[in-house]
Amino acid sequence: MYTKSVELHKEALEHIVGGVNSPSRSYKAVGGGSPVAMEKANGAYFWDVDGNQYIDYLAAYGPIITGHAHPHITEAIKTAAENGVLYGTPTKHEVTFAKMLKEAIPSLDKVRFVNSGTEAVMTTIRVARAYTGRTKIIKFAGCYHGHSDLVLVAAGSGPSTLGTPDSAGVPKSIANEVITVPFNDIESYKAALDKWGSEIAAVLVEPIVGNFGIVEPEEGFLEQVNELTHKAGALVIYDEVITAFRFMYGGAQDLLQVKPDLTALGKIIGGGLPIGAYGGKKEIMEQVAPLGPAYQAGTMAGNPASILSGIACLEVLKEEGVYERLDELGARLEQGILAHAETHGITITVNRLKGALTVYFTDEKIVNYEQAENTDGEAFAKFFKLMLERGINLAPSKYEAWFITTAHTEEDIDATLQAVEDAFRHMKK
């Protein structure tokens, strides 16, 4: 079934570190083996190098909300290719796109384009430090903010201790600038501010978590974080790399009616091409060069290909009924998964928000990383492989979301549920 994928992975191991260009693409978290190599994609479907077809819920870890090879986005990319994909000069298209982002996300007074979500987050931290004159940041356990040194930090031994490096090559001195606290735990957040408040430049928040599954903030949590942070003289940064344009046209901040000082964007806003952006209050953003002392630059930043692709993607998402449709399909999928789990005696919890969900193998409602970490990884690994064999492509990690796209249909959801039912039946044997 996967002969060519296995052969390709063996060859890749000779030339590419670990055989993959991002560790999340390996199957290490689901028991190992050769990852399936895809050859083409269209709409909600993948075809691998062996010719097997899959219904895709990976969606490239979130960006492909309109489905693969969407005609409107494809035409935009063709236009860019025909007119030059990289200028190194200003263009009218980047102004158009900046205006679209500002109209969609009201907290953005000014915007700057970069090349990835990692870059966007990294720069918001630099800007916050420049604006406040402070150096420390607070982040929440389990929330992934890219692979820059400052955010590759794990929790220390207590809720208000300094962090420890979460990767080789991250100096302890950098980790000492980060305090990690549990998500949805306002008392731990207060304790961190009581201890370090005068040194905190910013708190970095996923307003809706996407990196240990889909986890919503408890009622009042984000509002209290905003209030306490500002009282301490620090800034609030929202990492909306996953959430922006995922749950509604705009950001999670608009859905939840909370506003940060700075926002990092990525994934969906590129329409499938590499991009990042950050923005926020005018007086804070004017810290950025050439207006201010906080330096940030990029050869590829604002390139016409990514910008035109992003504009086209947002034009599709702005169409009436898009998010209602994603919510309907998400509800159909969630209800079916839960029904089949009950029928076959499989213990799961599903966290869903509109067109994104996570299936946890536990009976506990997941509200923080510690709970997600304690879910049954072996059960998920078995489920993942059974689903793959049945033509359903999921992320190879118990922490990741299933992403529904505008290309998915009721028939796709029903075919997926048939695979779920069969997988659960086999898991009970």
Swiss-Prot record:
Keywords on record: Cytoplasm, Isomerase, Porphyrin biosynthesis, Pyridoxal phosphate
GO-annotated biological processes: protoporphyrinogen IX biosynthetic process
Enzyme Commission (EC) number: 5.4.3.8
InterPro entries, alphabetized: 4pyrrol_synth_GluAld_NH2Trfase, Aminotrans_3, Aminotrans_3_PPA_site, PyrdxlP-dep_Trfase, PyrdxlP-dep_Trfase_major, PyrdxlP-dep_Trfase_small
Name of a matching Pfam family: Aminotran_3
Keyword Cytoplasm applies: yes
PROSITE patterns, per the entry: AA_TRANSFER_CLASS_3
Domain of life: Bacteria
GO cellular component, one term: cytoplasm
Cofactor: pyridoxal 5'-phosphate
Localization per record: Cytoplasm
Enzyme class at the top of the EC tree: isomerase
Modified residues (N6-(pyridoxal phosphate)lysine): 267
Catalytic activity field: (S)-4-amino-5-oxopentanoate = 5-aminolevulinate
Pathway: Porphyrin-containing compound metabolism; protoporphyrin-IX biosynthesis; 5-aminolevulinate from L-glutamyl-tRNA(Glu): step 2/2
GO molecular function: glutamate-1-semialdehyde 2,1-aminomutase activity; pyridoxal phosphate binding; transaminase activity
PANTHER family xrefs: GLUTAMATE-1-SEMIALDEHYDE 2,1-AMINOMUTASE, GLUTAMATE-1-SEMIALDEHYDE 2,1-AMINOMUTASE 2
HAMAP family hit by this protein: HemL_aminotrans_3 (MF_00375)
Complex formation: Homodimer.
Family in the record: Belongs to the class-III pyridoxal-phosphate-dependent aminotransferase family. HemL subfamily.
Protein name: Glutamate-1-semialdehyde 2,1-aminomutase 1
Species lineage: Bacteria, Bacillati, Bacillota, Bacilli, Bacillales
